[in-house]
Amino acid sequence: MKNYQRLKGLIAASFTPMDAQGKINLSAINKYADLMAKSDLTGVFVCGTTGESQSLTTNERKNILEQWIKSSNGRFKVIAHIGSNSQVEAVELARHAAEIG
């Protein structure tokens, strides 16, 4: 069983960066993560309502979470929003989040 810790400090609700055509800009997350790390945050909440979760596909949400974890480089916690109108998708997102950390 995992050892869970109580969260303390500021958790930012991140937006999902997109280009002019409305496609997700994963590379922008690197700069965004650097800014968050400099802001002395405890963590970021990824793909919540501020992050456009309801307008993204399950695969897009997975890719965004993976990029945030990579970009955070252990400097802050990354918390995944796994909610969905589909129970199957919510379970898939939860499993994915657990698998990648």
Regions found by a protein language model. Name each.
Residues K2-A12, P17-G101:
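Active-site beta->alpha loop and helix N-cap motifs at the rims of alpha/beta catalytic domains
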